[in-house]
Structure formats: structure tokens, C-alpha cells
Amino acid sequence: MFDLEYQLKNLPDKPGVYLMKNNLGEIIYVGKAKILKNRVRQYFQKSQKHSEKVKAMVKNIEEFEYIITDSEIEALILECNLIKKYRPKYNILLKDDKHYPFIKVTLAEDFPRVISTRKVTKDGSKYFGPYVDGSSVKDIIELIKKTFPIRTCKKNIVEEAKAIRPCLNYQIGLCKAPCAQYIKKSEYRETIDDVIKLLSGKHLDIVENFKLNMEKAAENLEFEKAAMLRDKINIIEKIGEKQKIILNNFDNEDYISLYSDGKDTCFQVFFLRNGKIVGREHFIIEDTFDTNSSTLISNFLKEFYGGTAYIPKTIYVPNIEDEALLEQWLTLKKESKSTIKIPIKGEKKNILVLVEKNAKTTLENFKLKYLQEKALYDNVLKDLKNILRLQEEPIRIEAFDISNIQGFDSVGSMVVFEKGRAKPSDYRRFKINTVKGADDYKSMKEILTRRFQHGLSEIKSIQDRKLEFSSGKFSVFPDLILMDGGKGQINIALEVLNAFNIDIPVCGMVKDNKHRTRGLIYNGEEIIINKYGSVMKFITRVQDEVHRFAISYHRSLRGKNSFHSLLDDIPNIGEKRKKDLLFNFKSIDNIKKATYEELLSIPSMDKKSAECVLEFFK
């Protein structure tokens, strides 16, 4: 049993990281402290003016643990790593923890390539980015390939290597074939230098050079060459237009600001590379009404740069907490100097004001869309309540489905909709353990039993410990259950609920002969819902989502065994013959279509095994 009083008394006066846990042992908050003793005790002192969010967290703390570090910077590094690992409920978490794409020029190679990557390493390459839009990176690389004859293959080509036959790209003029030694390293590097100039925003020099060559070609009556150069000039100018110069310097900088409306906050980030905006991104954090902006920005930086592949030389913010400590952490991550600056006036300040305006517009648009959707979903839930004659609107809806292919790897899925919106954080997957073969009814009974058994256990644990109601994995029960099937599936669900003495309405979602949502079955009666357009769309969405989620899980489980359910069940087909069949025919469909003679052409196949394959797929 965790003795809170004893643990608080014995906290060390050293720097470190603390982890708050709920009654289920889940880590709900990770924080760092210069002095653990002082920081952790503050949470449990009634005299402290805690925010509503902190008060809610403290009510759910069942125990805590801590890790001592040698310094505050070590504590910060560990805190960021643990937040990334555990994704605690009460930490500020960015929903889009993504690595942005970069354009990479592989300068460490004798004959460099231009490729897309999401990982920045010190490998001698030159990186351009980040770009928020992955398709933009792809477009730029494709345009570069059309303009500059550089290689796209992954071969390890060195200048002194033995020449090999060039590929089709050489024949159509897209590559100078360094693999065949048709171009020297120094000449190839001149082309790469032009690519780097273009990506660095110095495209006007390249355009001028191309124009001179175009004019010479026209004077010499080489009109085809002149037209080709004209097209390349257009492509280069198109790439240049993709990035807008807003500063006269050519530093790599990020500008971060925020806008709060009293309840929620929108963070906006502008990425400037070589004086150009190469992208921007926003993040909306809910329920920040009682947190000051400097704390919000400090927490945002830890989360954002803890997951990004690139840290710029300078980061501009309107204000910040722990500035020196965060600078030290960023510099360690970057392995070169990174500075946080708060501009007071001038063009840097003007850009930050622009970033804040964008954050304000983004949050307002988000709220407007949210209100519009809320009104729509409110009407859907009201209509659903009336159609089914329920006592209350079904605020939380859970839908269940079973997926299997050829009777193997049966899996179950549960998707959740709250207030009309999908809630992926509450989705659950079940691998069927007790049922062999394709038996959807028994499989459904298993997953429903497990779902509500876990839920009741969690509720009992919460009540026994006299804690505030905690959102465990299964402890929140639905107001309505939707089954992807008819009366048989409904009866299974009701049987499970009755066994646990739980009273929840159960509905079946039925489809027509074209596999489109047709209506609902409730209390033994089929209800046609096509006259309720918004309800029809909502039920179709739920049905599609639960099916998609089940199928995606099934595919992930099959993995390398995706052919197991068929080939392994054919008599006289062992591991060797299975591999040979797949190697030669490439797919199950091709094996199904194979003739007797084609099967016998495989060295490991004999007459009997070929006949077995034909008989199996007959």
C-alpha cells in the first residue's frame, strides 16, 4: 500500500523527474523539478492556488514515483523522453507529433542524389526544410529531376568503379549516367551545385544562365534545345515561387506565438529557412484557461522540439519560462548553438505579431466549425433518441464488429463516438482467444464479455479506493451499443449484458443487398431511417468506421502470415513448395489461375502436389 504522507516526508532535495499515477497504475502526469521535495509537495498543499486542471489531476493521483538526476538539464531531458514515451493525460500533448519532411542532397556520395527524408543526421548531406506539406516536397523533387540530369537510383556509385550499362533514365535524357562513367565527378557536382542554389533561394542566377543558353540555341537555329531550356526556366521559376522571401537574412528560424480565447489556446509555428517561409503549422490545446502564456510556450517547446527532427539556429517567442534551461536543452539536442529570443521591436517582432494573428484566425475558424458540427450532432442524437424511443440522448455510443478471412485470425473491434464525434483514444482491439474458426457469434460474445468484465473490475477498484471516478480503459459504459449485424448479434449482446446485470440499449445496423446501410433493428423491429438523412449518414459513418478499424487490425496481425490460411491448408504443399509457388506466381490469385502445366513447371512440384492445388482452388 502506497503511504502518501510517508513518501512526501522523504522526498529528496535534489533535481529530478516525478511521475504521478492513478488507481490503475497509469502515468497521468510527468514533471521535472529543480528540488523534488518542494515541487511535489506543492501539489498536495491546500494553501496552493491550483488551477482547475491541477485540482482534477490531484484528485486522481493514487501514488507517485520519482527519479533523481544530477542536474536540472538532465531532469528536463528525462522529462521530455518520458512524456514522449507515456503520453500522460494531464501533460500538454500535441495531437500531431510528426516528423516533417526535408529535402536531402546526399553530398557524402561521389554522385549525390536529391531525396525526401524525415530524419536529419550528421552524415555530410545538406538538408532543406522542414516542409509541412509532404506532397510539396515530392513536387519539388520531381521538378528538380525534370530540370537537372541527376541520378535517382540507390546504387553505390563511385568515380573509379567499373562502368555498368546505364538505365532508361539515360536514354530519355533524365540522367548523365555516372554509373557508366559518361560524366566526371567534377562536372556532375556543378549540376548539384545548381540544385543547391535553387533550394537555397538563389534561383535567379540559374534562370539567367539558362536564358543565355536559350538565346544562343535560338541564334544557332537549335529550336528544340531552346524550347527545352525555356521549359526548364519555367520549372525553376515555379520552384522559386513556392517559397516567399520575407527577410533579407538567410538564417534558419522558427517563429512561435499563441492566441488564447479564455478557454482554449492555438499555437502557430512559422518555419523560415534561408529567409523564406517554407511552411507553417498550428496546434490547438483545449482547457488552458488558467495557465499563463509563458508556461504554455515553455511546455509547448518541450513537446514540439522533443519530437521534431530539426532544431533551427534561432527560435523567436513572445515570452517564455525557463529560457536559459530550454536553450541549454535545445543546444544539446541540436549539437550546436540554438538560441531563444524575445523580440521587442523591428521586423522579428512584426513577424511574431503576424504569427499571433494567424493563431487567432485559426482558433476562431476551429471554434466556428466546432459549433456548426455540434449543432448538427445534437440534432442527430435527438433524432436517434426519438427514433429508438430512448429515455436519454445516447451521448456515448460504442459499436462492435468481428473480422476474419477464411476463418483465420478472428479479431474484434470497438469504436466509440461521443456527442456524435469519433473518439479514437477510446477505440479498443481484441484478438479472439477462445474461439477456433469462423464463428462470429461466439467471437462477439468473447469480446463483449471481456469489455464489460474489465469495465466492472475498474469501477470496483475505483470505488474500493474511494477515488474520484477515473477514466480507465473500460470503466466508462455506453448509452447505446451498435452491433454490425442483425438479430443474432443483438441477442448475443443482450445475453452478455444480462449476465452482468447491465442495462444498456442494443441496436443492430443492417445493410441492403448492395452492402449499404439500410436501417436499424431495435426491440425486434426493423426501423427504416432513410427519411432521417443526418441519422442515416451518422449510422453509415459508424458502420464504416467499426468495419475499417477491424479490418486494419486484422491486416496488421496477419503480417507475414497473410498466405497461411490458404497455402498451408493444401495437402502435399510444405514450406519449400509454398515458398516456390509464391516466388514464381507472386500472389495467391495467380496460383489460383495457374494451369496444371504451369504448376508442374515449378521444380519442387510433382503431379500429385499440382493436382492437390488445382483441387483445392476448384
UniProtKB/Swiss-Prot annotation:
Residues 204-239 form the UVR domain. It is found in: Cytoplasm. GO terms for biological process: DNA damage response; nucleotide-excision repair; SOS response. CDD domains: GIY-YIG_UvrC_Cho. GO terms for molecular function: DNA binding; excinuclease ABC activity. Residues 13-92 form the GIY-YIG domain. Its main location: cytoplasm. The keyword DNA damage applies. Keywords: Cytoplasm, DNA damage, DNA excision, DNA repair, Excision nuclease, SOS response. InterPro entries: DisA/LigA_HHH, GIY-YIG_endonuc, GIY-YIG_endonuc_sf, GIY-YIG_UvrC_Cho, RuvA_2-like, UVR_dom, UVR_dom_sf, UvrABC_protein_C. GO terms for cellular component: cytoplasm; excinuclease repair complex. SUPFAM superfamilies: C-terminal UvrC-binding domain of UvrB, GIY-YIG endonuclease, RuvA domain 2-like. Pfam families: GIY-YIG (PF01541), HHH_2 (PF12826), UVR (PF02151), UvrC_RNaseH (PF22920), UvrC_RNaseH_dom (PF08459). Belongs to the UvrC family. Interacts with UvrB in an incision complex. The UvrABC repair system catalyzes the recognition and processing of DNA lesions. UvrC both incises the 5' and 3' sides of the lesion. The N-terminal half is responsible for the 3' incision and the C-terminal half is responsible for the 5' incision. This is UvrABC system protein C.
